Amino acid sequence: MRKLLFCLFFLCFPWIWLRAQQRIAFARLPPFERAVVCVKFFEGFHGKSCYPYVGYGHQLQKGEHFSSNMPEWQADSLLRADLMAQFDRFKCYGKDALLLSLLAYNVGTGRILGYGKQPKSQLLRKIEAGDRNFYQEYISFCRYKGKVLSG
């Protein structure tokens, strides 16, 4: 029994050590790179069934001709360009710019900034007012038609 436990420990130890190293490596990434990794993980790679979304959730715009079977490097490049465009839009919000950029990438800029009859989001209003207690407003975006979305 002792030998079995000893063998199991040494079989599992490298895997546990590797997972710990991956967490440390993730924590050492710059914030923008962590955002890219998170989007890739939760969004996943979109195939033909997800049209008009391609790559890692890029919504095709008028005049764009990206294929749904694009290579991973192109999808990565497109994701980074989209996130950087969102970041440029929200950079005036300082330390919250990346948070707002990621949220806008997922739900759309209009849901955050408001458009037409859609008012500015309560989350953005709290951030502008300096209120750091906006957790409930942030997680309210994880619902679609009343159902909680995974990711």
Model-derived features with residue positions:
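Sec-dependent N-terminal signal peptides
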Residues: L4-F13
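Alpha-helical scaffolds flanking conserved acidic
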Residues: F10, F32-V36, Y93-L102, Y135
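Long, amphipathic alpha-helical surface segments
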Residues: I16-H46, H58-G63, M70-Q86, T109-G151
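Early exported N-terminus immediately downstream of N-terminal targeting peptides
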Residues: Y51-V54, H58
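Short helix-to-loop capping/linker segments positioned immediately adjacent to catalytic or ligand/cofactor-binding
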Residues: F87-C92
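Hydrophobic pocket-lining residues within nucleotide cofactor-binding pockets
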Residues: Y105
